[in-house]
């Protein structure tokens, strides 16, 4: 198996344009890993799928195409907000700060509880890097990992192990 060395950003050397989903480093454009992976799959045609599901069956039996598209957009927005809150909570938790008064949605609370009961207890976490940016100069690829953490051999894995988490908020 070939090993590809990936660099990790420790400063602001990598910039990300969220709207265009493009990374730049030293004025060079890098393809996001998400964009790269999309090349291997057919594009999801939300309009056509919503049209087909409208007034069909199950949870869509009483929904129009527009209502379905709105529902999907709301779920995407909710997922983005959950990611933001979990990221903020992790940054605060590992820097001994307080979270504040902002209420957390149920899925963010579930992510927090999962972290506290499954990750911290089982893996003996040392370092945590939420929204960790990585890149490869030769391939001009870059991406952001939802959270990476270093843990030791007292847990389920070997010493100096790093694990990566990709938060999902779907059912």
Give the ranges of each region predicted by the language model:
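Catalytic cores of nuclease domains that cleave nucleic-acid phosphodiester backbones
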Residues: 2-15, 20, 67-164, 170-171
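Charged, glycine-rich intrinsically disordered N-terminal tails and low-complexity linkers that flank
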Residues: 1-81
């Amino acid at each position: 198996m070939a090993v590809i060395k990936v660099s990790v950003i420790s400063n602001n050397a990598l910039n990300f344009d969220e709207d265009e989903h493009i990374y730049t480093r030293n004025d060079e454009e890098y393809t996001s890993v998400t964009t790269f992976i999309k090349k291997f799959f057919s594009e999801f045609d939300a309009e056509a799928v919503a049209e087909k599901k409208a007034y069909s069956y199950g949870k869509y039996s009483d929904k129009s195409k527009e209502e379905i598209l709105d529902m999907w957009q709301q779920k995407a927005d909710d997922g983005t907000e959950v990611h933001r809150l979990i990221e903020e909570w992790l940054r605060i938790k590992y820097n001994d700060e307080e979270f504040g008064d902002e209420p957390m949605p149920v899925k963010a609370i579930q992510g927090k509880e999962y972290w506290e009961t499954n990750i911290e207890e089982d893996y003996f976490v040392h370092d945590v890097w939420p929204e960790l940016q990585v890149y490869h100069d030769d391939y001009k690829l870059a991406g952001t990992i939802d959270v990476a953490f270093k843990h030791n051999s007292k847990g389920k894995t070997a010493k100096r192990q790093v694990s990566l988490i990709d938060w999902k908020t779907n059912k």
